[in-house]
């Protein structure tokens, strides 16, 4: 069984849409464009018989088949497709909490592991101040070169955040990393949090 949940309300709604397509055996295909990146988008498309890919995972529902894209499937873990009625009729929603989370392991390249921890552990905390940090480069000495943005750019606490928060977390998670360096122009204090 797939990691995605399609509620009964969503299944009923989609079955009604599919019945209007006048194509016997038509189903849906669920996929994510740019999975594991900040630009990931979860999509549902009509899937006529034969349009599915051989590596897709079929999920047999009562009145149609949902084909899950093989590349997207790990990013669809805990995803829920639902349909909620409202005064305007209703709305199909797709919640895929892992769509933008990169899939990394200890064998992944260093820059991918750094980006993973920046996105999953560091940036959620910085977001409360309207800020974020991104990886610019990893230099030969094993130093991650980072750039602050948003409320962190020009913030008086950026040095403390860099050394006591970001560097400690990254060194703990990635032993071969030797340190971090900030290349942000902090003279621009327009959006600074502190």
Curated annotation (Swiss-Prot):
Q: List UniProt keywords, sorted A-Z.
A: 4Fe-4S, Iron, Iron-sulfur, Metal-binding
Known partners and oligomeric status: Homodimer.
The role this protein plays is: Involved in iron-sulfur cluster biogenesis. Binds a 4Fe-4S cluster, can transfer this cluster to apoproteins, and thereby intervenes in the maturation of Fe/S proteins. Could also act as a scaffold/chaperone for damaged Fe/S proteins.
Show the HAMAP family listed in the entry: Fe_S_biogen_NfuA
One MF term from GO for this chain?
A: 4 iron, 4 sulfur cluster binding
Annotated transmembrane regions: none
Q: What is this protein called?
A: Fe/S biogenesis protein NfuA
Record keyword Cell cycle present: no
- Which family does the record claim for this protein? Belongs to the NfuA family.
Binding positions for [4Fe-4S] cluster?
A: 152, 155
Lineage top rank: taxon: Bacteria
UniProt xrefs under Pfam families: Fe-S_biosyn, NifU
| Bound cofactor: record note | Binds 1 [4Fe-4S] cluster per subunit. The cluster is presumably bound at the interface of two monomers.
Q: Which GO terms describe its biological process?
A: iron-sulfur cluster assembly; protein maturation
- Cofactor(s) needed by this chain: [4Fe-4S] cluster
């Amino acid at each position: 069984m797939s990691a995605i949940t399609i509620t009964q309300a969503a299944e009923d709604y989609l079955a009604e849409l599919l019945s209007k397509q006048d194509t016997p055996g038509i189903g849906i295909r669920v996929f994510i464009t740019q999975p594991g990146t900040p630009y990931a988008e979860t999509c549902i498309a009509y899937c006529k018989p034969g349009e599915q890919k051989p590596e897709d995972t079929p999920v047999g529902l009562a009145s149609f088949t949902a084909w899950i894209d093989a590349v997207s499937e790990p990013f669809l873990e805990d995803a829920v497709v639902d349909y909620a009625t409202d005064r305007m009729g209703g709305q199909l929603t797709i919640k895929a909490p892992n769509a933008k989370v990169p899939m990394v392991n200890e064998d992944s390249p260093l820059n991918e592991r750094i980006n993973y921890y920046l996105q999953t552990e560091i940036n959620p905390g910085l977001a409360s101040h309207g800020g974020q940090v991104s990886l610019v480069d990893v230099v030969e000495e094993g130093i991650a070169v980072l750039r602050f943005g948003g409320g962190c750019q020009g913030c008086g606490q950026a040095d403390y955040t860099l050394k006591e928060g970001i560097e400690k977390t990254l060194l703990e998670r990635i032993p071969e990393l030797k340190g971090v360096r900030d290349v942000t122009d902090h003279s621009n204090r327009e959006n600074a949090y502190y």
